[in-house]
Amino acid sequence: MRGGSNNYRSGAPIVKRIGGGGFWMSGTVRRAGDGKPLEGQRIQIWAHTTEGYESDWESHGATLTDANGVFRLEKPQIVPAFGQPHGHLAYDSGDFETVFLRPVMNSARDKSLEAHFVLKPV
């Protein structure tokens, strides 16, 4: 698995929020080639937060993209662990190639982080 797969756990549940919230992970999912937004794609999110380590099962959750290919999931504040504060995101549903992303925050005080997927069919 390419970069960002640290502490990845297959099958994280689809949730409305991870923990107490207060921090937003969001982005888009599009198809490679034509850039079409992809609806109903499962995106898994995890990170080291004020409520737990990125290896803790409770720090993992997933969400689905809407009709515009947009996803958004609230989670506890991300905090630095082994360097810059960052999140982990994965597309792992099988219709497209698996992708792992590890976006880095500009500041530990940021309250949101974006990541954008371009998926290639399998």
Predicted regions and their residues:
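Beta-strand-dominated extracellular/periplasmic modules and repeats
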Residues: 1-122
